[in-house]
């Protein structure tokens, strides 16, 4: 078997082999593409404020917050211009290198079948 060299990219994950023989992995390019794809197209008024936390402490998600009909989900998707399930799926793939987001992403992913207005607000907060 021939040595083909060191890997630099694998499935949108950048692999850096440092001089001390350690390996670093990151998905900076993929994360940037997620943020530009979903946040820049969001039609809801988003402030320029950046948050230090992934979810606000006062955001409590319950069964009462879910959408009760498909029409409500479609209206929220049009209002926020974010496809909730696709964005959650992209963020779940990002968790392979950003484990600090896992609690917030999985909390929002629980409601991917019937997201309500509060869930969309939480998703926008996470993307900020």
What is each stretch, according to the model?
Residues 1-128:
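Long, low-complexity, charge-biased intrinsically disordered regions
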């Amino acid at each position: 078997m021939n040595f083909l060299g060191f890997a630099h990219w694998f499935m949108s994950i950048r692999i850096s082999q440092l001089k001390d023989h350690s390996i670093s992995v990151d998905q900076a390019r993929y994360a940037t593409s997620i943020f530009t794809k979903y946040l820049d197209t969001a039609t809801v008024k988003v402030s320029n404020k950046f948050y230090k936390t992934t979810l606000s402490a006062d955001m409590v998600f319950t069964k009462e917050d879910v959408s009760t009909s498909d029409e409500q989900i479609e209206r929220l998707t049009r209002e926020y211009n974010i496809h909730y399930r696709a964005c959650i799926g992209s963020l779940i793939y990002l968790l392979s290198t950003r484990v600090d987001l896992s609690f917030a992403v999985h909390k929002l992913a629980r409601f991917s079948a019937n997201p309500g207005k509060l869930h969309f607000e939480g998703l926008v907060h996470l993307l900020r």
